[in-house]
Curated annotation (Swiss-Prot):
It comes from Prochlorococcus marinus (strain SARG / CCMP1375 / SS120). This is Aspartate-semialdehyde dehydrogenase. Its EC number is 1.2.1.11. Belongs to the aspartate-semialdehyde dehydrogenase family. It comes from the Bacteria. Phosphate binds at residues 108, 221.
Length: 343
């Protein structure tokens, strides 16, 4: 099924699938902040979350159990309920005539599904066949930096290490980090139930499943999705992903090798003018981006841009970005806003 018809020239009937999760709740906040044109908003989730009340534009809205009836006459579905739910309901949603912006990893690497970061490859939105995939959070942050730099000089290789907050594992993981940190301070042994190990005053390699190549699933997402977004299938890129005891916002240490030497000041200028990026560098005070700088913010923060002393063609830099906002909810809504431009 190909769904490339423009949206109606009126406010949309919009469904948020998975509205009760951390990303779903953030979607509601951002829809209101950006005055997204909504005629009717439907909140859909699992049976466990049905009956919950969420707040939107001064009104209490009741979350309903996801069902085929919930998608009748819907124009757009923002889905953040996980890959299995997206796969289960895609055909039903598209058959009802709605377009899906999907936050899960279910369809990201499907050849005919656009994988979009609006600041990087916006035209891909209009190639959709009923579903547009939202990239992984760490991939979005990385792509925002790589795209404007690669427009200046070809990139030969990327080495990235991530420092991923509890928010990447959802609201329950954030609450667990708070509780286990208090347990440690009280002299008790922390017992993790949501994450595989205690994150309180601790860090561990990302807990997604290991693949046959000994990279974890999260690392392979970054590698494969970045290649697809930048349309560089042979890009040399490697990643190491780590979960750290931060509540919200991810960080990344990035080494980028170019085809030729890239002057540091030129890179600073390009990134400072790039959409979605705030340059944060106070060299005198040794002050660079931190997760608290970007928590609740739309833009990512980039700094510590410097020459790689071991490679004259490489630069080092550091970034922080809110995983729930630009890494998920905001990016999905920006995709929806692009779709509106074809109305």
């Amino acid at each position: 099924m190909t769904l490339q018809k423009p949206f109606p020239d009126r406010p949309l009937t919009l469904a948020v699938l998975g509205s009760s999760g951390a990303v779903g709740a953030e979607i509601l906040k951002i829809l209101e902040e950006r005055s997204f044109p909504i005629r009717e908003l439907r909140l859909l989730a699992s049976e466990r979350s049905a009956g919950q009340v969420q707040f939107f534009k001064g009104e209490d809205l009741v979350v309903k159990k996801v069902s085929p009836e919930g998608f009748e006459d819907v124009d757009l579905v923002l889905a953040s309920a996980g890959g299995s739910i997206s796969r289960k309901w895609r055909k039903v949603i598209n058959s009802a005539g709605a377009v899906i912006v999907d936050n899960s990893n279910a369809y990201r690497m499907e050849p005919d599904v656009p994988l979009v970061v609006p600041e990087v490859n916006p035209s891909q939105v209009f190639t959709h066949k009923g579903l547009i995939a939202n990239p992984n959070c760490t991939t979005i942050l990385l792509a925002l930096v790589l795209a404007p730099l690669s427009a200046q000089l070809p990139i030969k290789r990327v080495v990235v290490s991530t420092y991923q907050s509890a928010s990447g594992a959802g609201a329950r993981a954030m609450n667990e980090l708070k509780q286990l940190s208090q347990d440690v301070l009280n002299g008790n042994i922390p017992k993790s139930e949501i994450l595989p190990y205690s994150l309180a005053f601790n860090l561990f390699l990302h807990n997604s499943p290991l693949q046959s190549n000994n990279y974890c699933e999260e690392e392979m997402k970054m590698i494969n999705e970045t290649r697809k977004i930048l349309n560089q299938s042979e890009l040399a890129i490697t990643a190491t992903c780590v979960r750290v005891p931060v509540l919200r916002a991810h960080s990344e240490s990035i080494n980028i090798e170019f085809a030729e030497p890239f002057p540091v000041e030129e890179a600073r200028k390009i990134l400072s003018n790039a959409s979605g990026i705030k340059l944060l560098e106070d060299i005198q005070m040794n002050r660079f981006p931190m997760p608290i700088d970007v928590t609740g913010k739309d833009d990512i923060a980039v700094g510590r841009i410097r020459q790689d002393l071991s490679n004259p063609k490489a630069l080092e830099l550091w970034l922080c970005g809110d995983q729930i906002r630009k890494g998920a909810a905001l990016n999905a809504i920006q995709i929806a806003e692009l779709l509106l431009t074809r109305s």
